[in-house]
Regions:
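Bacterial N-terminal signal peptides that target proteins for export
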Residues: 1-9
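Kelch-like beta-propeller repeat domains
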Residues: 21-370
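Bacterial N-terminal signal peptides
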Residues: 10-18
Length: 370
């Protein structure tokens, strides 16, 4: 989950001035597909943005933490049941968290780590057990982090990368579920926050963009679990942060949207593809609207297409077979930022929360249907 508390609070002050010029600019070349539609769902119990949403093994979705516009930070947790289409409160976390991460472990439990609690970044972590609906503290990270990434490796361990404390961090660490401890691993070549991390078929992890506050990078690097080290791997066409990345069926990675560091004034409509064989990036066409703050609002469908569900009123899908974007039937009430999109067991997608162009968090949810 990537959301910088400092950046979020500052940007809320200027949303009303710039949002109309930066959000919802349509590009007619994008067509509409009748294969998919989006419909309203029952609301969450609490308005949230910057929360996490994790599909657990029994098919429910764990919604954890987040915040409201007024600076209310949550330790509360909800569970969405596809069987009933409803949200119900679960046991709360031990700490209030926004900009944290949630990772489904191989044992079916969920690792919640870091984030911001309103007074600064956190190093604490806890594990949620769906069988008992309870959180248990686990070892602390070696560094306080918010706006970082956490990636489940093939070994079952979790790679934690970058993020922000007082500045962007280059450090990384690995969580071992067997010991419940975090251990340091090699550093990145650059400090990064608001970046993306994508597990590739090779087992390596692709890190793209991010950077320090309002200073995004175009560079990318690969983490090799075998050596515990990072190495540079090409550069994107443009510097991006607050963007999204998703693995494509062919093993390449799709990089979507983001901003040039000016936030609302600098949103991108463009996309790029990382070629895992050539270690290079190439442009991949434009979305229907410029979108940013969408890191958790992207999901790969069972068809292999990529759903982009944040940053605009309309959802769209990217078809790797044709290399094109298509709008989805139906729309949300407004563009939403720092929302979540979670692929459900039946192939539908739960879209939840986020804040609007006035910075107001929502409890509304939608279901993307195939």
């Amino acid at each position: 989950m990537t959301i910088t508390l400092r950046n979020l609070l500052a940007s809320l002050l200027i949303l009303g001035v710039v949002a109309c010029s930066s959000v919802g600019k349509n590009h007619p070349a994008v067509t509409t597909t009748s294969d998919f539609t989006i419909v309203p769902a029952i609301n969450m119990q609490t308005p949230r943005s910057g929360h996490t949403a994790t599909l657990i093994r029994d098919g429910r979705v764990l919604i954890a933490g987040g915040m409201e516009r007024n600076g209310t930070y949550f330790n509360s947790v909800e569970l969405y049941s596809p069987a009933t289409g409803s949200f119900n409160f679960a046991h709360s976390m031990s700490a209030r968290r926004v900009g944290h991460t949630a990772t489904l472990l191989q044992n079916g439990k969920v690792l919640i780590a870091g984030g911001f609690d309103g007074s600064g970044s956190l190093d604490s972590a806890e594990v949620y057990d769906p069988a008992t609906d309870s959180f248990t503290p686990t070892g602390n990270m070696n560094s306080r982090r918010g706006d970082f990434t956490a990636t489940l490796l093939r070994s079952g361990k979790v790679l934690v990368v970058g993020g922000e404390a007082s500045s962007a961090l280059a450090s990384a660490e690995v969580y071992d579920p067997g010991t419940g401890k975090f251990s340091r691993t090699g550093d990145m070549t650059s400090g990064r926050t608001m970046h993306t991390a994508t597990l590739l078929p090779s087992g390596k992890v692709l890190i793209t963009g991010g950077g320090d506050y309002q200073k995004p990078l175009a560079t990318a690097e690969l983490y090799d679990p075998a050596t515990g080290s990072f190495s540079a791997t090409g550069s994107m066409a443009i510097a991006r942060y607050k963007h999204a990345a998703e693995l494509l069926p062919d093993g390449n990675a799709l990089i979507l949207g983001g901003s040039d560091g000016r936030d609302w004034r600098g949103q991108y409509v463009s996309a790029e593809i990382y070629d895992t064989a050539k270690h290079t990036f190439r442009l991949a066409g434009n979305m229907s609207v410029a979108r940013f703050k969408i890191t958790e609002a992207v999901a790969r469908l069972k068809t292999g297409e990529i759903l982009i569900a944040g940053g605009g009123e309309r959802c769209e899908v990217y078809d790797n077979r044709t290399g094109s974007f298509k709008l989805v039937n139906g729309q949300m009430d407004t563009a939403r930022f720092y929302s979540t999109a979670t692929l459900l067991a039946d192939g539908q997608v739960l879209i939840a929360g986020g804040y609007d162009t006035h910075g107001v968090a929502s409890s509304k949810a939608w279901v993307f249907k195939t």
